[in-house]
């Protein structure tokens, strides 16, 4: 059940947020083209034991666009500013897809704000994606979203529904901009979640895990790595949204609640 909704004025942006449940704070960062409700059953599942603060990025859903390009770093700064306004000094963070990239940037740019990270279906560098994913990004058009849940959600919630082509173009530019982040510099432990048929290459997810201290023979190690990796069977990129039961259980165990 949604207990609160509102807008935070951050960095010239009126950023929409929802608060569900009670307990220790857990920030949920949705994927590209997504509103909070498109996260499906995950937010209610996590809100059973946590105070979930779910946001919508610039140009997404209830959050109107402004004259500013999209970037992972800027979205992370917006989220950090929202937490500051809410009086939340530190929180756990769950990010899916685009939100996973923002979560990584939040951990790198604002380490004091982040206790633990959950990175779902995201990469730390642009070469982590399958080539066909990049090809799809290059050829994407607004018309491809006609009749989809993403377009329907935008039309239902956006202050200016006619701005959808602008959203597509800005996300296209973001997606096609190369990046490579030093994930080994993350201070927060991370749970990496990926589908076995996701858009991010499995080798990339394993490499991320290794960069965070994973990939050891645990039975002979002094202790298990602080970060963890889970590969979800029979799961695609979009299909991660249908795995709320699996994911919420793993997230709860990792966060210790």
Give, region by region, the residue ranges found by the protein language model.
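N-terminal cap/lid segment of alpha/beta-hydrolase-fold proteins
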Residues: 1-14
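Conserved loop-alpha-helix segment in the C-terminal half of the alpha/beta-hydrolase fold
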Residues: 44, 194-235, 241-246
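Flexible "cap/lid" loop of the alpha/beta hydrolase fold
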Residues: 101-109, 115-151
């Amino acid at each position: 059940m949604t207990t609160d909704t509102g807008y935070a004025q951050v960095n010239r942006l009126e950023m929409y947020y929802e608060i569900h449940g009670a307990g220790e704070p857990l920030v949920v960062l949705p994927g590209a083209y997504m509103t909070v409700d498109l996260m499906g059953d995950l937010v209610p599942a996590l809100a059973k034991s946590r105070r979930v603060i779910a946001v919508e990025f610039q140009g997404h859903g209830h959050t109107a666009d402004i004259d500013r390009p999209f970037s992972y770093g800027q979205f992370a700064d917006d989220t950090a500013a929202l937490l500051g306004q809410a009086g939340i000094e530190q929180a756990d963070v769950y990010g899916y897809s685009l939100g996973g990239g923002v979560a990584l940037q939040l951990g790198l740019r604002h380490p004091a704000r982040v206790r633990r990270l959950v990175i779902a279906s995201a990469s730390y560098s642009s070469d982590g994606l399958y080539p066909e994913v990049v090809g799809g990004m290059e050829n994407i058009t607004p018309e491809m979203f006609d009749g989809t849940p993403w377009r329907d959600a935008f039309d239902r919630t956006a202050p200016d529904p006619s701005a959808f082509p602008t959203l597509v173009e800005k996300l296209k530019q973001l997606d096609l901009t190369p990046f490579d982040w030093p994930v080994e510099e993350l201070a927060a432990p991370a749970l990496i979640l990926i589908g076995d048929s996701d858009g991010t290459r499995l080798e990339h997810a394993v490499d991320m895990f290794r960069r965070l201290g994973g990939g050891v023979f645990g039975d002979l190690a002094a202790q298990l790595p602080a970060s963890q990796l889970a590969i979800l069977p029979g799961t695609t990129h979009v299909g991660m949204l249908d795995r709320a039961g699996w994911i919420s259980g793993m997230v709860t165990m990792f966060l210790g609640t």
